Regions:
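H/E-rich (His + Asp/Glu) clusters that bind or coordinate divalent metals
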Residues: 13, 22-24, 41-44, 179-310
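Hydrophobic faces of well-ordered beta-strands that scaffold small-molecule active sites
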Residues: 33-37, 58-60, 83-85, 109-110, ...
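Charged helix-capping and loop-helix junction motifs
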Residues: 120-127, 152-158, 197-201, 229-233
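Active-site gating/metal-coordination segments in enzymes
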Residues: 64-155, 215, 220, 310
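C-terminal segment of N-terminal export signals and the immediately downstream linker at the start
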Residues: 19-40
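N-terminal export signals
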Residues: 2-24
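Helix C-cap/helix->beta junction micro-motif
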Residues: 77, 132-133, 167-168, 210-211, ...
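N-terminal carbohydrate-binding/catalytic regions of secreted carbohydrate-active enzymes
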Residues: 45-73
């Protein structure tokens, strides 16, 4: 085959593949905002992911050091992305770093995934900035390790109500294993992702009811597992907290279809290996929520929190 013919054939094949992927992307009945998509190392791969899973917009969770790269991604695909900012709260300049990024276009703080107590002076300084600038702060709350040697993140969740009460002007978004394990009043200590029926009266359920400044991010295996383990409970939970729940994926698959490495460093989450977390969680929500509740969770609540234009 001549080089010109080869190149022409390659271009046509690539276009056909893109068209096939676009056609196979699910239609969720309206725009969908993924509030938990980490900025990736390769340009435009975040856009590839949201296209593949039928998501229209996403919040790019971005470390302070990568703000310029996130801005480039946003400018390349206008109308699809906004960005967050995260920095180690124990840094002496943490408050200034956050203020600089937020005043330069970041719309939220997070995700905060550090080995600190939720009710610590370092975290208090972050909460103060979030309240000062009117942005949400996303917390990764995990006690059980995903791999040998991993240490807990954002400890002290059983007393988190004290933080919510002490910082009423700060909007918190809870996420991750221990946050979602506490959807039930019966929380095991030997694993991060409990299964089986949910016992009413869980701490997370109670905090969402009691504190207007707490929201819940349904991303990752933790959120998907909590939604899937007891569907009768979930139906009522979604209605009860329809204004406090936001969809997110925290998905690492390459294409919005499950390709690439997913859950590679988290053996306990193997149930979602080879799958797109966004697709899986949206499917559960579509099955269990009414159209109005589905729209609130997948768009309205998150768009309001993260200042995403309609």
């Amino acid at each position: 085959m001549e080089r010109r013919q080869f190149l022409s054939t390659t271009v046509v094949a690539a276009a056909s593949l893109r068209s096939l992927r676009a056609q196979s992307a699910p239609d969720w009945g309206g725009p969908v905002l993924d509030t938990h998509l980490h900025l990736r190392a390769t340009a435009d791969t975040c856009f590839t992911h949201i296209q593949g899973c039928g998501v229209s917009n996403a919040v790019l969770l971005t470390p302070a050091a990568a703000q310029d790269r996130a801005k480039q991604e946003i400018e390349t695909r206008p109308g699809h992305f906004v960005r967050s900012v995260s920095v180690d709260p124990s840094r002496p300049d943490a408050q200034q770093v956050l203020r600089d990024a937020l005043r330069n276009g970041a719309v939220s703080i997070g995700e905060l995934k550090y080995h600190l107590a939720l009710n610590s002076p370092e975290m208090h300084r972050v909460y103060d900035v979030a309240a000062e600038l009117g942005v949400p702060v996303m917390m990764h709350i995990q006690t059980f390790p995903h791999f040998e040697g991993e240490q807990p993140y954002n400890t002290g969740y059983p007393e988190f109500g004290q933080v919510l009460k002490a910082f009423p002007k700060t909007t918190f978004v809870g996420h991750a294993d221990f946050f979602w394990a506490n959807i039930s009043a019966d929380v095991p200590t030997d694993r991060g992702y409990p299964d089986g029926p949910i016992k009413p009266g869980g701490l997370t359920d109670k905090l969402l009811s009691d504190y207007p400044n707490l929201y819940a991010d349904m991303s990752a295996n933790s959120g998907n597992n909590a939604l899937s383990r007891d569907k009768d409970f979930t139906k009522d939970f979604l209605v009860r907290h329809k204004d406090k729940l936001i969809f997110g994926s925290d998905c690492a698959c390459a294409d919005g279809n499950g390709a690439g490495i997913s859950q590679g460093n988290n053996p306990e989450a193997a149930r979602l290996a080879g799958k797109c977390v966004a697709r899986e969680t949206l499917a559960v929500l579509k099955q269990l929520a009414s159209p109005d509740v589905f729209r609130a969770i997948t768009w309205t609540n998150g768009a309001k929190l993260f200042r995403v234009p309609a």
